């Protein structure tokens, strides 16, 4: 490799989403604080400016993300990108529904491609060098790492994987390391413009659906200013399944002015497909490499607060690299421990996910919703589950409280008589 001892520490980041941009910003901020020379190169082939590429995430952001950005990255939260404020949720079962309001600040709905572009531009302004190229292969050596691209190769000291669920990047990483990407759910996203009056009548709630359909784990309708975003997720959801979802009576009743979809905007009801992790990746760090965000599977069940987790893990990887090192032992001792808030809650979240799916498909969810109308603690648990504002450990505590269990049992018994 063509590197010398006098060269600054060179960190290469694969991926320019929030995780990669946050990691680059954190590296430069921390390096300035400890007066260490670093070079950060970020590889991203997508063009976020001009919205030439899209992110299939629904795009609802909430605390603690604004404070995290401003405190840890010195980057103001882009409130000017706000398309709508989300004040609560409406949970739909098969026949029942429940409005859920929390005490926290409203969440912010925005276009994810605009947020991603803002973060990447902020990183560039601070000194991150962005190479508009796609990584194609890599090599690890005792004295560094080489990333081959569809442009020129890049040599560095340590590699940060921030490529989300990109299967090509995961494949070449898996060939040269023991990395195994997280298991994934697929999603289909669409949108349409209902008109100003219909949007005002729709309100500021996200409508969350837990249908009986065996292939759909959850769906949602999210207001975004002058349009609504609709998404479904499951092991293998596809376009026909989205069309079926849109025909369900409970969904159709919630959709504002659906009959005018496509009449005012030719792009209405175009379907976009994506993937997101539903488990922790295996071997997501090693000598000279570490995964962050979706690439590591470091997210909550139901993908709540995915951007917050991406930014958090990007910052934590930067702290490990500059304060401890970039060996496998350094990442194991520091980076993994720093993410214990996410890792430790995963088993609770996975169990909650399976229980919710069982209740929805067995018809029990309606009884739980009826019980929550009367029991505040159960209602608080449901809000925490759909909003992502509470750890799943806390949600289980509220769900299994005697008052919650009594209310659920009473609702089930009334259903059977």
PLM-predicted stretches and their roles:
Residues 2-19, 41:
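Beta1/beta-strand and adjacent pyrophosphate-binding region of the FAD-binding site
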Residues 59-63, 101-122, 168, 190, ...:
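Short beta-strand to alpha-helix junction loop
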Residues 82, 137, 238-321, 326:
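FAD/FMN-dependent oxidoreductases across multiple families
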Residues 94-111, 146, 223-234:
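Helix-loop-beta segment of a Rossmann-like dinucleotide-binding subdomain
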Residues 322-417:
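C-terminal helical "tail/cap" subdomain of flavin- and related membrane-associated enzymes
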